[in-house]
């Protein structure tokens, strides 16, 4: 457990608007507070199984995320969402400054490693999910607007997982 969660962060919750959550997803393409690209230019967030998004890896900074769904519905930029994560991230760690803008932030008192061990002991054997939550899509028309009678080509990538033990795609 310590090899996977070595930092002993507490689990916190906070409330973000949809716009703030989308901004946090944008911050996976890293810049520091001064706008400089750090030594790790991309850090992908782990997300709950009910959240997915598409992105354009070639887009300008701040414009990578092209769609987000929560529970199969489009993210409402004005709605508030309650999220949970590690205290380090919700304080803006690893350049995820959008998380620090959350409100009504609460410390659950649970340590990440201990909660993970407890979850595994209560839910074993675990069944991993192999679905993608982030898919790269390029070729989306500027502004996301499509005019009737016109055509365009979309390219999709990052459709399959490449981790050790993931079953081969059959479709």
Which residues are covered by each model-predicted region?
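Feature captures C-terminal
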Residues: 1-171
């Amino acid at each position: 457990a310590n090899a996977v969660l070595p930092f002993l962060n507490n689990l916190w919750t906070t409330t973000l608007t949809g716009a703030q959550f989308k901004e946090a997803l944008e911050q996976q393409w890293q810049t520091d507070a001064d706008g400089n690209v750090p030594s790790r230019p991309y850090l992908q967030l782990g997300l709950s199984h009910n959240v997915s998004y598409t992105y354009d890896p070639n887009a300008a900074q701040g414009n990578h995320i092209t769609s987000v769904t929560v529970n199969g519905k489009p993210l409402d930029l004005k709605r508030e969402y309650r999220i949970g994560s590690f205290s380090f991230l919700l304080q803006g760690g690893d350049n995820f400054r959008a998380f620090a803008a959350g409100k009504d932030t609460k410390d659950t008192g649970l340590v990440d490693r201990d909660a993970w061990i407890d979850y595994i002991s209560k839910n074993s054997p675990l069944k991993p999910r192999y679905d993608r939550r982030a898919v790269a899509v390029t070729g989306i028309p500027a502004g996301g607007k499509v005019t009737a009678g016109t055509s365009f080509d979309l390219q999709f990538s990052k459709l399959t997982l490449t981790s050790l033990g993931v079953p081969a795609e059959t479709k």
